[in-house]
């Protein structure tokens, strides 16, 4: 089974442009791998069609974050969560230059340490990647529900900045997966 699933979001081009405007108001330094949480109220005000989609699909907002990856940069192999509570799913929305970057899932890796990463917005487990085996990859060109409990990384191997909007929900959205 693939660790991702395409999700059809009505009026996504409109939502994408509204989120890009919000991104410019939220993140000011694009020179390093950066993330910034935004509030439900702000997204509700600026992106009402996205909130309509969430409501129509019984998705209860937990956190929404912008993730920016500079050119020729990435994020190391990790899983989202910690030893007490792991995240399972993230709804990732492509915003800018996602066509030539990849989210990659891995096998044969083990947790090295759990870290609280304020800059990444949650606890993550850094993985030992010496014997890693790639099991899947995705160029995020449309909205996808992705597994974040499986070791994964991001590679932006292009000369352009990559930006996405990533949402987490309580409870986890199993009903969108199955």
Regions found by a protein language model. Give the residues of each.
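Catalytic core of non-heme Fe(II) oxygenases with the double-stranded beta-helix
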Residues: 69-143
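N-terminal leader segment of winged-helix/HTH proteins
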Residues: 44-57
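Secondary-structure boundary elements
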Residues: 56-59, 96-101, 157, 172-174
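Residues that flank catalytic or metal-binding motifs in active/ligand-binding sites
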Residues: 62, 87-89, 99, 161-165
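Short, well-ordered beta-strand micro-motif
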Residues: 8, 68, 94, 145-147, ...
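A short glycine-rich, His/Asp/Glu-containing loop-to-beta-strand
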Residues: 55-73
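Catalytic core of Fe(II)/2-oxoglutarate
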Residues: 116-178
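N-terminal auxiliary "cap/dimerization" subdomain that precedes the catalytic jelly-roll/cupin core
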Residues: 1-47, 159, 167, 171-178
């Amino acid at each position: 089974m693939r660790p991702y699933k395409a999700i059809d979001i009505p009026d996504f081009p409109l939502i994408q442009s509204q989120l890009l405007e919000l991104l410019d108001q939220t993140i000011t330094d694009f020179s390093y791998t950066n993330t910034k949480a935004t509030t439900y109220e702000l997204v509700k005000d600026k992106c009402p069609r996205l909130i309509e989609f969430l409501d129509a699909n019984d998705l209860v907002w937990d956190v929404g974050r912008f993730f920016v990856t500079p050119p020729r940069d990435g994020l190391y192999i990790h899983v989202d969560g910690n030893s007490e509570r792991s995240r399972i799913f993230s709804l990732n929305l492509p915003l800018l230059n996602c066509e030539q970057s990849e989210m990659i899932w891995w096998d044969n890796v083990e947790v090295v340490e759990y870290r609280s990463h304020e800059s990444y917005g949650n606890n993550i487990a850094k993985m030992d990647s010496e014997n890693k085996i790639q099991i899947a990859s995705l160029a995020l060109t449309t909205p996808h529900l992705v597994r974040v409990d499986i070791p994964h990384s991001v590679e932006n191997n292009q000369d352009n900045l990559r930006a996405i909007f990533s949402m987490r929900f309580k409870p986890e959205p199993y009903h969108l997966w199955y």
